[in-house]
Regions:
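Gly/Ser-rich oxyanion-binding loop with an adjacent helix/lid
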Residues: 1-43, 208
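C-terminal nucleotide
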Residues: 36-208
Length: 208
C-alpha cells in the first residue's frame, strides 16, 4: 500500500479487499493502509454515477495541492475528518448503515467546502452533480437508505445496500441513463490474465 500511495491515495486503499483504513502517518513508512479488524457484514453496494467522463479541467493532484496551500478551511477539514474515523470504524463494525452514510456525506461535503474556498475559488461540481445529490436526498426522504459521496471530481457515488439498488436505479436512470455502475466491496488486489479481465469487464457491463 505504501508503493501504491506514491501513485494515488485512492490506490493505497485499494490494495486490500473489504473495508480499509489508511493511516495518515508522518513519513513514507508510517503512511499505509490495512484492512479493518472487524469487517461489515452488510450487503453494501455503491452506485457510481458518471456525471462527466471528460478530463478534469483541474487535476485532483493540482486541485488538492492548491487547497492545502490556500484554503482557510483545509486544516479544519483535516481535523474534522480525523474526528470521524473512530465513529466510522464503530459504525462499520456494528453494521450501522445510517451512521456510515451520515459520516461519509459529512467527510465528502466538508472536503468540497475546503476546495471551494481555495484561491482562486474553484469547484468540481457540475449541474448534474447537484442533481444526483438531490435525487439521493429525495430517495432518502422516501425512506430509502442512500448516501452520496464524491472524490475530487464531478462524479457521484451512492452508498446503499443490495435490496435498494433497483429502486435507486429506477430513480436515477431517467436523468443519467446507462452512466451508472453498480459495485460492491472488492477483494484484494491481484494479478489477472487478459481473459479474466475481459470476463470481469463483461460482467460489470451487464449489471443493471
Amino acid at each position: 500500500s505504501r508503493l501504491a500511495r506514491r501513485g494515488s491515495g485512492s490506490a493505497t486503499r485499494s490494495i486490500f479487499g473489504g473495508a480499509v483504513i489508511w493511516h495518515r502517518g508522518h513519513d513514507d513508512a508510517s503512511s499505509f493502509a490495512e484492512p479493518l479488524a472487524i469487517q461489515p457484514s452488510l450487503p453494501l453496494r455503491m452506485l457510481v454515477v458518471t456525471v462527466s467522463a471528460e478530463k478534469k479541467a483541474v487535476s485532483s493532484r493540482k486541485g488538492m495541492a492548491n487547497t492545502v496551500a490556500t484554503s482557510p478551511y483545509y486544516d479544519a477539514w483535516v481535523a474534522s475528518n480525523e474526528s470521524l474515523i473512530e465513529p466510522m470504524i464503530t459504525a462499520l463494525a456494528e453494521d450501522d448503515l445510517a451512521l456510515i452514510g451520515k459520516l461519509t456525506e459529512l467527510s465528502s461535503m466538508r472536503m468540497h467546502a475546503a476546495i471551494m474556498a481555495e484561491e482562486p475559488p474553484f469547484t468540481y461540481f457540475l449541474p448534474e452533480t447537484l442533481r444526483a445529490w438531490q435525487l439521493v436526498q429525495e430517495q432518502r426522504a422516501l425512506g430509502i437508505p442512500a448516501f452520496a459521496t464524491m472524490d475530487a471530481g464531478p462524479n457521484v457515488k451512492i452508498l446503499t445496500t443490495e435490496p435498494y439498488v433497483d429502486i435507486l436505479l429506477t430513480a436515477l436512470r431517467p436523468v443519467f441513463g446507462d452512466r451508472i455502475l453498480s459495485t460492491r466491496l472488492g477483494p484484494d488486489a491481484s494479478i489477472i490474465t487478459k481473459e479474466q479481465f475481459d470476463d470481469t469487464k463483461s460482467a460489470i457491463a451487464s449489471q443493471g
